[in-house]
Design a protein with these regions (language model features):
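N-terminal periplasmic accessory domains that precede
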Residues: 85-88, 105-107, 132, 158-179, ...
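Membrane-embedded beta-barrel scaffold of Gram-negative outer-membrane proteins
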Residues: 312-314, 318-324, 328-334, 570-635, ...
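Transmembrane beta-barrel wall of Gram-negative outer-membrane proteins
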Residues: 176-178, 183-213, 218-255, 297-312
Length: 784
């Protein structure tokens, strides 16, 4: 009698499923399709699921791919109490996340920012315009996948250092319930509820809800609320449906940090002796003190939905169409500048030198300047139509993927920058104490202008992984993109609200770009546990500069040029190429290692070099100055090791070396390129390191007792191109202990920043934000 057996295989980094096999039973061949079930004709079969990486879309074992990938499973996030992307990135070598303004998160991979973030394989298009933005919590996440190196061949523009893919929990037929409540330092309350199973007929579901509130250690209270629902299943033998809906409403405190570090060497007025060096922080500041205005706020409201349909014709062809829609609203008001009072007269106790004159400075009082009011409302439509499958030509097996991607981004940005008109109230003109910050009064706001932008992207792509033989694999991939952008600024709002009348199409300025991207690589597998690879790949990033009478333009050779007013392209796209070699080793479930050595070259970066109203060389500028400044590159290597010596114990370590520098900068009247060549690129540490250990006792009277600890290191980070300002390097240690009760409840105590390290990883200009000191989190979680 034959008994059917269904096995559900996870997609985590090292998950394998093993059943006991009869001698003489034939082995099941690997298939490139990521089937969720297998029908087995015998009750006893041996099967091992090769680790696959969804971000590459080919459904082949990771050992076949000439790329570097890393995966963080949800188990790691849960063990370490991680619910945000900045904490998760500490366990990804070569990745750094920096938060600014309290909630805007900027991700750099292998030294380059503007990195692409995806959710369930769908690009977050906010990165097409902005370099930082708030991001969702991670409570509904199954795993985080990182594809390093240029990825434009699969995901289009701007994928230079890599792509981060957030994979949310999929619907499953297995009934499950997960509930967690946690409470910790600074009134940190977290509640999460997840459940799922079979809904009716062929449909399964998975749902997750999360609420978090925290007073904050610097009186920076925050609230986060999110919900997620996934529905799906096999409608027939050939058809699958997957529907996902997510929403969030988050409130964040804006964050302007502590008063400025010293802008120059500071001297005492009484005797001209030096009091502080340039860059020193004032002594005696209360790091828990909050200097923001009482009226500051930041909301992020988001709704996203996707529908995926897949039809399988057979092993040779599978057609997939995925349509998604995202609405995102970032609503912000923040006082951004803490300025010391200054005077040309010797009325204060200190002064600094500006050229040949003395500027007297009051280090006891502050002026609250530049309250900034804006709201970005973005609507994105994304459709991916793909055909993939497997066929054979002679002795060569082909795993192919071809597709067409259409993306439309409609963004309306509203601003209220006219102080006194758009921002008003007693808090606008207040002055405060450096050592005793307090409320300066309320402020209210309105919008006066709207900035309207539209982006359209069409991508046509094809990739093929050729299995030449058991030991040699080859990847060939190409993509052609059409990109268009249009914008109009200064559109009047209606009654100060986030509303406007759409201007005529003739008032928009436009730019358009088309380009080809590629990736090619070889994999050699000398023995089953070891694979060696080499690859080369390219990327591009369109330039959205449009013509303006108020701007002067310089090319990458330092020469001024005068574009045509009707030109569709002012600057060439930013381009880059990566060469990479690496090795991957996996011995059963005991030991795994990944190593990669890379070089990335980037051309045509565009920057603002001077702003209208600035005084340069004694001249007050009547126009903005913008130009493509030259070339930079990133050289380095990544290493990650995981060792499981005994049952229940896992040790993982990772190290990233990333040396990103300016290599060629043309000199022009507004940029001294010679002094910048060789400087380190901003926001990227040279060294990053982590190690973590998870141990759970599986037998005896202490069965269910678990221990976790991690140590991370971040090297100093330069904050500017001139390499004059840095975030100092620091080590961080976290630890936790947990115990699983017989009733499926796990109790856990997390201690973060065990050694109370004093560190900085965030700043607003010269206003540094201190990191959180030692803190605790106690949680109880139930799983069924």
């Amino acid at each position: 009698m034959k008994l059917p057996l269904t096995l559900f295989f996870g997609l985590g980094l090292t998950l394998t499923t093993t059943l006991h096999a009869q001698d003489g039973q034939p082995k099941r061949e690997y298939t490139n399709f990521q089937d969720t079930t297998f029908q087995l004709s015998e009750i006893s079969v041996t099967a091992k699921r090769p680790m696959q990486v969804e971000v590459m879309k080919l459904g082949v074992p990771a050992a076949y791919l000439p790329v570097t990938t890393n995966t963080l499973p949800s188990r790691l996030l849960a063990n370490h109490g991680i619910t945000n992307i900045q904490d998760a990135a500490r366990f990804l070598p070569g990745v750094r996340v920096q938060t600014s303004y309290g909630a805007f998160q900027q991700i750099s991979i292998r030294g380059f920012d503007h990195s692409i973030i995806m959710v369930d394989g769908v690009r977050d298009e906010r990165s097409s315009i902005d370099n930082s933005y708030p991001f969702m919590d991670l409570t509904s996440v199954e795993r985080i996948e990182l594809l390093k190196g240029p990825a434009s061949v699969l995901y289009g523009q701007s994928a230079v250092g890599g792509v981060l893919n957030i994979v949310r929990k999929a619907p499953t037929a297995q009934q499950h319930v997960n509930a967690r409540v946690a409470y910790g330092s600074y009134q940190n309350l977290q509640t999460t509820l997840g459940f799922g199973g079979r809904l009716f007929g062929p449909l399964n579901y998975s749902a997750n809800f999360n609420y978090q509130t925290q007073d904050g250690w610097r009186d920076n209270a925050m609230r986060r609320l999110s919900g997620y629902l996934a529905l799906g299943g096999k409608l027939s033998e050939a058809d699958e449906l997957d529907i996902r809906i997510g929403a969030l409403r988050d409130f964040y405190p804006t964050e302007i940090g502590l008063p400025d570090v010293m802008p120059a060497d500071i001297y005492r007025t009484a005797d001209d002796t030096k009091a502080y060096d340039r860059g020193d922080m004032l002594p005696g500041l209360d790091k828990k003190a909050r200097y923001n205005s009482e009226s500051d706020f930041m909301y992020n409201r988001n709704f996203n939905a996707s529908v995926m349909w897949r039809h399988t014709f057979g092993e040779a062809a599978r057609l997939t169409d995925k349509l998604s829609y995202t609405y995102d609203d970032i609503d912000y008001f923040g006082t951004e500048d803490l300025a010391y009072l200054t005077s040309d007269k010797p009325i204060y106790k200190h002064y600094y030198k500006s050229g040949n004159r003395k500027v007297y400075i009051n280090l006891d009082s502050l002026r609250y300047d530049f309250p900034l009011r804006f709201e970005h409302i973005a609507r994105t439509w994304n459709n991916q139509l793909e055909l993939n499958g497997r066929f054979t030509t002679g002795s060569v097996k082909h795993n192919y993927l071809g597709g067409y991607s259409l993306i439309a981004l409609y963004r309306n940005s509203f601003s209220g920058y006219d102080l006194g008109q758009d921002v008003y109230g007693p808090g606008l003109t207040g002055q405060g104490s450096v050592y005793n910050p307090h409320s300066l009064g309320w402020m209210d706001t309105r919008f006066s202008k709207a900035f309207v932008s539209r982006i359209y992207m069409h991508g046509f792509y094809l990739q093929d992984l050729l299995e030449l033989n058991e030991k040699l694999k080859m990847l060939l991939a190409g993509r052609y993109d059409l990109y268009s952008y249009k914008r109009v600024s200064g559109v009047p709002t209606i009654d100060g609200r986030a509303e406007f009348e759409m201007p005529a199409d003739s008032l928009f300025t436009r730019t358009a770009t088309s380009t080809f991207s590629f990736r090619a690589g070889l994999v050699y597998i000398p023995t089953q546990p070891l694979s060696l690879f080499a690859s080369v790949g390219s990327y591009f990033k369109p330039d959205n500069t449009t013509y303006s009478d108020n701007t002067r333009y310089f090319d990458r050779n330092g020469r001024e040029f005068f574009p045509n007013k009707d030109s569709r392209k002012i600057f060439d796209p930013e381009r880059g190429i990566q060469v990479e070699v690496g090795a991957r080793y996996e011995l059963d479930d005991k030991l795994s290692a990944d190593f990669s050595l890379f070089y990335i070259n980037r051309e045509n970066e565009r920057q603002y070099m001077a702003y209208k109203g600035e005084v340069i060389n004694g001249e007050k500028l009547d126009k903005y100055v913008v130009g493509q400044v030259g070339r930079m590159d990133s050289r380095g290597f990544d290493l990650e090791l995981t060792y499981r010596p005994i049952r229940g114990l896992s040790l993982t370590a990772g190290y990233g070396y990333t040396d990103t520098r300016l290599r060629k900068i043309a000199t022009n009247p507004y940029l001294d390129g010679e002094n910048l060549v060789g400087k380190r690129y901003a926001n990227s540490p040279l060294h990053s390191f982590y190690v973590y250990a998870d141990y759970t006792i599986r037998e005896g009277v202490l069965r269910g007792l678990g221990f976790n600890f991690d140590v991370t290191y971040q090297d100093e980070v330069y904050r500017d191109f001139s390499n004059t300002s840095t975030f100092p390097s620091y080590w961080m240690t976290d630890a936790s202990i947990s115990y699983r009760l017989p009733n499926r409840v796990r109790l856990r105590l997390n201690v973060n920043n065990v050694f109370n390290t004093d560190y900085y990883n965030e700043a607003l200009d010269s206003q540094y934000v201190p990191g959180m000191p030692r803190n605790f989190l106690i949680s109880a979680a139930y799983s069924l």
